[in-house]
């Protein structure tokens, strides 16, 4: 509770001193829990939707809308003036904390082609190499990202098909 009260006070002060600025919450949680960072519209204006990220990859490879549709059904609507931040990757990894063990095993079998790319529970790869440098898959995932309700976030380098460097 203190976190959310702090965020609402921070938002009030940011709005007062720096109007037009946006607070973005990076909360790797289930949608119903992450939605608390919106604070009924008085907290962060944008909250990352972590559970959606791996499900977009699953849907692509399975050729099935179910992984995406299921998590969107569990996602509360953002309050007025707020949005979910949607993304295909972030600066760390394709995080697999918000999937079942079975789904994680599937993702590892499908996308973990280089053992150096394993990071914690996830996969540390850039978008293009993660998808086997298949342009059609990269484009399809980006179309999906841009068509879902929310704010699409593109991680730098993904727009040009940047490759991996596991030593950075």
Positions of predicted regions on the chain:
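Active-site and adjacent substrate-binding regions of carbohydrate-active enzymes
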Residues: 1-168
